[in-house]
């Protein structure tokens, strides 16, 4: 399927289908073409990737996989390497890997020579979210994505063949962001929302997720949701903040427990719903489904640990912790939440986790 962004200008195409890398593209506009490739992805898909690179005369540069590449050290190393290759502002980088590879490559493209071209080639489910919207960045010692820029890709080539080699944890982590996009489309009681019921029917359990049931349908849905939100608010001054649903507590969980991003966000979404006006029965229904998909119970530490991490979140304002919350009659809103309310929701979360079979 071909989707096209609907900004006022500088739009780009997003291709989502199996075997998309084998289609014909014209990259001759770019004087140099360099792919920054997650080395783990390259090992798993070397033949497929090499065919694409050779067909389009793209030089390959292997980089570490995952969040470990998003450091100032790797940034400066890659930038110096690219400068030694005499790239120009008409050159193009190809990000072949997951969301972290896209974040990193996009940030390099945004800052090198004050901006060169780049194309996203996502290889994970999670990257469906990161490949849309133009957010790029690397991490600082004190938190994720604290150094970054907005940079739109020229194109997104989403080849679903890459998803076949994902581990079950990677599939679940990526599917979490799709769940987020589904919940962002909810209205009224979550348990009665048509889209929520539909995804629960399509992907009932861990086996369905493992076999990637209807994955093209739900990745496309996630991309369309993200595109609509980003079109309305590209630079995160309003409704785009809703895309941070589940991320405030989720980032604290991710940082402290060293969990995959999406897994942490699943816990974060449940916590955010507990801060909202959603009924416990609706929340338990959602939790049970997430656990059928493979989400494991988390042994939480002291609340104060998570509270201090949440205080460092870059979405906060005036030292107040901001959360994206859901109200059944009014939809989503960004709200400052005080420590007493946060602590109470945390204790409820622990209680509900204990009640799960």
From Swiss-Prot:
Q: State any single GO MF term.
A: nucleotide binding
Give the GO cellular component terms, alphabetically.
cytoplasm
Q: Report the main location listed first in the record.
A: cytoplasm
Q: What cofactor is needed?
A: Co(2+); Zn(2+); NAD(+)
Query: Kind of enzyme, top EC level?
Result: lyase
Q: Which reaction does it catalyse?
A: 7-phospho-2-dehydro-3-deoxy-D-arabino-heptonate = 3-dehydroquinate + phosphate
Pathway in which the depicted protein is active: Metabolic intermediate biosynthesis; chorismate biosynthesis; chorismate from D-erythrose 4-phosphate and phosphoenolpyruvate: step 2/7
E.C. no = 4.2.3.4
Q: Which Pfam families match?
A: DHQ_synthase, DHQS_C
Task: Return the SUPFAM superfamilies for the record.
Answer: Dehydroquinate synthase-like (SSF56796)
Q: Where does NAD(+) bind?
A: 99-103, 123-124, 135, 144, 162-165
Its Gene Ontology biological processes? amino acid biosynthetic process; aromatic amino acid family biosynthetic process; chorismate biosynthetic process
Location comes to: Cytoplasm
Q: Which Cys-Cys disulphide bridges does the record give?
A: none
So which domain of life are we looking at? Bacteria
Question: What's noted on cofactor binding?
Answer: Binds 1 divalent metal cation per subunit. Can use either Co(2+) or Zn(2+).
Q: Which UniProt keywords apply?
A: Amino-acid biosynthesis, Aromatic amino acid biosynthesis, Cobalt, Cytoplasm, Lyase, Metal-binding, NAD, Nucleotide-binding, Zinc
List the CDD domains hit by this protein, alphabetically. Answer: DHQS
Summary of the function given for this chain in its UniProt record: Catalyzes the conversion of 3-deoxy-D-arabino-heptulosonate 7-phosphate (DAHP) to dehydroquinate (DHQ).
Q: Record's family?
A: Belongs to the sugar phosphate cyclases superfamily. Dehydroquinate synthase family.
State the name under which the record lists this protein: 3-dehydroquinate synthase
Tell me which species this is from.
Macrococcus caseolyticus (strain JCSC5402) (Macrococcoides caseolyticum)
GN (gene name): aroB
